[in-house]
Amino acid sequence: MNEIVSYQPAKLPAAAAQQYQEAARRFLEHSQADNTKQAYETDWSHFLAFVQEMNLPMTGDLLKVAETVVIYITHLAESDYKVSTIERRLVAISRRYEAEGLDSPSKTLMVRQVMKGIRRELGTARQGKAPMLTKHIQRWIKTLGNDIISTRNKALILVGFAGAFRRSELVALDVQDLAFSDKGVIVTIRRSKTDQEGKGQPVGIVYGSDPTTCPVLALEAWLQAGEIRQGPVFRRIRGDRAGGKKITPDRLSDRSVADIVKDLAETVELDPALFSGHSLRSGHITQTDATEDWSMRQSRHKSLIVHRGYKRPSDLLCKKNSSGQLGL
């Protein structure tokens, strides 16, 4: 009585089978809420734009594609995205590949291990970092003295902010990368995320309207004070036996840039935990009155989607909002 009887499926008419297949597709389409599907589409578009900008492989060998995903999530982590956002984008990438009948690079050991490290370092409750704005920098500069550390830090902050530089680009600068003129300075980035071949990307920084906050004058003052004529622009400063400060030949680390930005925030009574080295770059893009075309030239973004990803909710209430241009 309790014997298991083998099951022989009945053959369905072709019309019935097709009807069930169509119903299954309909159920699949309704398996996710509209806002979830929209979020995944947005996440996929961001990933696609990044991959195209970086010229990275999306198909072929699974390990190569996994390396692409690793580079992408590392970029997100370094750009102060929340862990929850990075995880959601991995899901979006996975779903897109699996929908095409391909193995998901998001599920490879390489990607899972890197994501594990990101969670440990950033924490699952991390908030996106705040942009550093002109008003913050102006208040900070008023507190500075004329000592060598203040001179260096002022130049670092102003050049980083005006040039929309990544912290890795700032500390990699050499004197030979600077070309001064009566209009400002051309800074050549020898290698960056969007220039892996090292062809060089020129970035222009013009003289400011206020001498106390002019990035070009601050840079000139630092080079002159430090008697720096070649080699690294931004260098470590150590205490000497006489109790003074000595500029070393050693290049400043990108971690030091983050520390200086956090010190700036604390000095002007902001929460340093909300800021990072990336706050200079995001602050430039968030605040600039330049057109998107010129802003993207300065930040060296090739993708409008990636560039617009820097915009914060507060930007929705800026004076350029079209609701304020209606004469109401």
Predicted features along the sequence, with ranges:
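Extended, non-catalytic subsegments within catalytic or DNA/protein-binding/adaptor domains
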Residues: 1-328
